[in-house]
Amino acid sequence: MPRDREYDQWGYSGTRRDGGGRYGYRDRSRDERDRFRDVRDRDRDRDRDRERDRGGYRQDPRDRRYSRSRERERRGSGSRDRSRDRSRDRSRDAHRPPPSGRPHQPSGHDSTKSSNSMSETSSTSQVTGTTPNTTNATPSQAEIDAKKAAKLAKVAEWKRKKELERSKSASASPAPSTAPASPKAGFSMSGLSGLRKATDQGQVKRKMFFGGDSDEEDAGRKPAKLLKKLGEKEGSGKSEGKGRGGSQSEAKNASEKNGAASEPAEVDPLDAYMSSLTLPTTTSVSIADSTPLENLNVWEQVDTLEKSQDPTLDLSALSKRKEIAIVDHSKQVYEDFRRQFYVESSELADMTEAETNELRLSLDGIKIRGKDCPKPISKWTQLGLPGPTMGVLNDLRYDKPTSIQAQAIPAVMSGRDVISVAKTGSGKTLAFLLPMLRHIKHRVGVETHTTTLSGASSHPLGVIITPTRELCVQIYRDLRPFLAALELTAVCAYGGSPIKDQIAALKKGTHIIVCTPGRMIDLLAANQGRVLSLSRVTFLVIDEADRMFDMGFEPQVLKLTQSIRPDRQTVLFSATFPKKMEQLARRVLSKRSSDSLGPIEIIVGARSVVASEITQFVEVFQNEKSKFPRLLEVLGKYFAQGFFDEQSEGRVGTGESAATPIPNPKCLIFVERQESADSLLKELIQSGYPCLSIHGGKEQADRDQAISDFKSGLVSVLIATSVAARGLDVKGLGLVVNWDSPNHMEDYVHRVGRTGRAGQKGTALTFLLSDQERLAAEISRAIKSSGNAPPAPVQLMTERFEFKVRSGTEKRHMYGFSGKGLERLQDERDATREHERRAYEGDEAGEAETESSTPAASTANTDIIPKPVIVVTPPDSKSPTTAYHTTLQINDFPQQARYRASSNTSVSRVIANTGCSITAKGEYYPPGRIPGPKDEPKLFILIEGTSERAVKLAHHELSELLVSGLVKGARYQV
């Protein structure tokens, strides 16, 4: 119904009481409703504001006129009102008298005006010699002045008492020397005459106390303001300390000034209290008195430069360094432990010396070096092992011991230090696990406090050290069945996995730890050595000992062995053990004065020999492209038949091969570089072969998963670098392919030893290029050591190489086990240190005194990189993007620096910034090696761009990345 008719029905339309006509009452009623609504809304808005101030504002569902957009505008307008209120309050506060105890601080636009007025007032007072007129002051101002005077009197009285107490304490102490004190670099709050004005390292360290960079900036700003005030009062001509009279005269002068000046300068009680305190002094070390960098070694140079850049590193440097505390064994009290657990059976005791030699000859020609070596066994029952251990051996179907087990287990159980060398796949792991378990089980039973895994039992009794992570995991898996039967525990610790999980496992308690050297050092250095201790270790095993030293682990291994008690039992196992490595490995053997027999060396077969169960093939190719079609042909035959064998020119020997098909056959392909592994993986996947790859550039979780999938049969082809050449045992692995030939004989033996294990047949195929004569000579040595003749093409390449060596055109570079990891280790360190020394010599003396957060390596050390030479590409270039190009040599820099400059992340960022094309080319050459005329050049980065400016910019950014990696590359990585 229309609104007018509604009013007519109620009788409001016919009366003209106010002269408004027909709609007069309606208008009046509407005005009343609007007035009521305004009042209601005002009250509601007031309630809403109250709720909002309390933090509990919530939209009223009954308020239909609520709108989020209008509410947002209302709040926004409120912020503008608050801004206007602040400006209004600021102008009001400018004319308000200062509060008691605080001098007036003019702010903003009126600072100039107030300062001018103050200067005029003070000058007038000085000229006339009279006080300013204060008769016009209001009563409130007079009250404020009276309060100020009373407060100053209290301050003067308080200071007088403090000075009296100080004089009493000074009289009780010895009288100081009458000689004037020299200014100190450090300072206290009671005396400031010795303060330095110049910026030095002392002031840099002082920032740690007085803030500026900390979160509590107000707390740091307060002492700074206090220093400024006290410095103005003290002056340079006054002495540091004041007596009682000085304090009273100072208070008197302050009170007189307060009565004479219109703006009295008074002392706040908090400031006065702070002035009585003495902050800890710091000693400033000048740059001139510090030790020059050239007198320090590389590691001290890096630490010194980093500390000068950031003073906070002084506090945390010790906690970040992975150092193991040196143990003084002469001051330690160790408990005696039992070593002898082997009792010769009557059956072996009745054997004569001739029968013993005949038995050793039948067991793959065992050779013994050492005194009083036990006789080899022929059955497990002759060892006297515990019942649970025998049960596990029966469950695993280990019918009888292998050659190395028959001789090594009795020797180790006799308590002797043993060096064992045996071919791959001969059961070396079980040869040291069984004696270790027998040794530790006895100690757990004897030591009552180790029966429960708590307290001191978190420290292991036995340690197994391996060179690679994959071997560490495999030994731990072989150990687990025996742990459950004997009620023992073990922890597997290796790099690439979270260390917190391994620390948690150690805290629960462990008897055996299987580890890599780097992670063991991490655990020993964690929490200042409170996480793990090797003081209770009495049985030490180093598996693949030769590779441990060859990979450069000698310093780490020596550190670990130094932390273990010297009368321990040490056992070394490996498949290859050159005499030079043997001399170095003997350094870790224990030197017991009570043991005059010395260690026992057991050699099964030759020192570096390929097992007779492996059929070897070596094929020579003219170029790299012809290798992949041959690989596809071999894989096709292998997976179709279950084995691979053919009468070809590259076959080694004429013996029988693996003619029996293998169920679920698997193939392992070895490459030399990580890039080769990734590229070959893509090509095989495109050809229809599902495969995986592992190398040192992958995460440890990915490597573990790849090996697990390969063992379970999810994939049949695995591509790997030499990280899988040691200890990897896979059932059904019947074919090993060396896509890239190994560079030394021992690596070849370990690679092909992944097949033909535990008496099974296997095949090994090696690809050689026609110009790889040096590698052919190494493979020829390995084949001859196994009692076979190398193929004719390989023998021809070997003869050519020997002729070049005799004529002097080639040098016989010995790789790997003849000194790769040890003889060149010091040369590589010296070369790295030389680069770092040159890098840090570029800094000027004045630059060390400046405060900078930029690393030194990225600011002034780019002088070691030559200036870019921009070359213009000929006009007939294939692409216009390569009109200009230059090169950046990275071969001679440390590995960390090379990685920083050539990683995908760094290259992508430089490409995005400059638009240049960046490619890594060449081949890495170790220090001291020079590429020949036909060899690839040293490793470098090719930079190509459309303009000279872009190429220079890309070269500059890559140079900074390269040099910034020197500091990290100089750090000791474990």
Curated annotation (Swiss-Prot):
Assigned EC number: 3.6.4.13
Reactions it catalyzes: ATP + H2O = ADP + phosphate + H(+)
Motif (Q motif): 378-406
Residues bound to ATP: 422-429
Location of the Helicase C-terminal domain: 654-800
EC class of the enzyme, as a word: hydrolase
Keywords assigned: ATP-binding, Helicase, Hydrolase, mRNA processing, mRNA splicing, Nucleotide-binding, Nucleus
Biased composition (Low complexity): 113-142, 169-185
Residue ranges constituting the Helicase ATP-binding domain according to the UniProt record: 409-595
Gene Ontology molecular-function annotations: ATP binding; ATP hydrolysis activity; nucleic acid binding; RNA helicase activity
GO biological process, one term: mRNA splicing, via spliceosome
Role this protein plays: ATP-dependent RNA helicase involved spliceosome assembly and in nuclear splicing. Catalyzes an ATP-dependent conformational change of U2 snRNP. Bridges U1 and U2 snRNPs and enables stable U2 snRNP association with intron RNA.
Full protein name: Pre-mRNA-processing ATP-dependent RNA helicase PRP5
Record organism: Yarrowia lipolytica (strain CLIB 122 / E 150) (Yeast)
